[in-house]
Amino acid sequence: MNRKKISLVFVFFLAFFLVGCTQKASDPKVDNWDKYQKQGSITIGFDNTFVPMGFEEKNGQYAGFDIDLAQEVSEKLGIHVHFQPIDWDMKETELQNGTIDAIWNGYSATDERREKVAFTIPYMQNQQVLVSKKSQNIQSVSDMKDKVLGAQAGSSGYLDFEGQPELLKNIVKDQKANQYQSFNEALIDLQNDRIDALLIDRVYANYYLQTEGILEQYEIFPAGFESESFAVGVRPADQTLLANLNKAFVELYQEGKFQEISQKWFGEDVATEQIKGEEN
């Protein structure tokens, strides 16, 4: 057999092997818990630029509050967690297609999203803020009149921006926000004065600017929207996974592990009343 034929045979068997090793997509219409237990894993979709919730470090490793929390939860569930970076703007589509089994990365539980996704109990609160350079002299929403705004496509902040135009959209330049695929891209444009302010999660803004040592160069102020709850999103049919996630959250708090992770990333206990078991 000549080299060309050998190469073709090798490529064929390699492709066959790789396909066989690929995790089969989950059926979006059924409870997949038995499947997860049999294969020993679930796939979590996340935005690998969302510091400090879940992000990729320079060495290629994943880190963040949600990454640590998911790993602790996976031990409770007795299954492995596979982290899959996704286009955040396509997260619900990825979930419904069965290519991921959960959305877990600072994912805000909004009424609009509840139409497609089943949420766990919320595990922490967040607020949408505006970040601007102090040199721009923008310190409140009213200062945003005719200013250029940036936001991440598909983010809860952008959904608020579009859904409640009277609070911010109607006053910014052209009544629109420049959309970015990642927060990092938006921050680069903010730093280079291509946008005047960035609509962003408070947890990201505080952590990133503090870590970079540039917090004193920026103004951070409320965007005017209600605070939001972070939760894990699964397919509505996956009720067993949903119940097990909720149980694991509460148990981790009772054991003090949730607080350890929270202190590591935020320097405080960010757990919701539901996680603490104090909800009326």
Sequence positions of predicted segments:
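C-terminal motif of bacterial Sec signal peptides marking the signal peptidase cleavage site
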Residues: F17-G20
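Extended ligand-binding regions for polar small-molecule ligands
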Residues: T22, I67-K76, S142-V148, A153-S155, ...
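Extracytoplasmic small-molecule ligand-binding "clamshell" domains
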Residues: A25-G106, E255
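Flexible hinge/capping segments at coil-to-helix
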Residues: K35, S132-L149
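Periplasmic-binding protein-like
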Residues: N48, Q125-S132, R202, Q210-V250, ...
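Ligand-binding cleft/hinge of the Venus flytrap
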Residues: E56, A70-I79, G157-Q179, L209-I214
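Short helices/loops that flank or line small-molecule/ion binding pockets
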Residues: E75-K76, Q84-P85, D89-A102, K116-A118, ...
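A ligand-binding cleft/hinge motif common to bilobed small-molecule-binding domains
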Residues: M90, Y107-E115, D160-G163, I188-N192, ...
